[in-house]
């Protein structure tokens, strides 16, 4: 999160001054998405959303869906044709939220850098 804040790509969902959720929005190609065991839907330019988190007390209240919708609007405004995201294979609640938001499962990726380099993730994409 420190790098996300430093790079000014962190967005917060809040209500009455209470933080309900947070996500990172990336407009540069994600090196972890260069190779996929599967196939991305689009070869066009994409934005990426990362580290989508909803506060425990806000879960089940549509916060994730609203954050995804905001990310989609930002991506469209910036001229992107799709949004990509990834999650852990065991993160079933996030996979359900992604499906509900219109993301399609595209295949498996491995993180290309950072402390979890090489870790398996499931890649999703939504065409805007």
Regions found by a protein language model. Name each.
Residues 51-54, 60-73, 96-100:
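Conserved acetyl-CoA-binding loop-helix of GNAT-fold acetyltransferases
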Residues 1-10:
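Active-site rim helix/loop that mediates acceptor-substrate recognition in acyltransferases
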Residues 22, 119-125:
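Short hydrophobic/aromatic beta-strand or adjacent loop that forms the aromatic wall/cage
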Residues 68, 75-87:
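Conserved GNAT acetyl-CoA-binding A-motif
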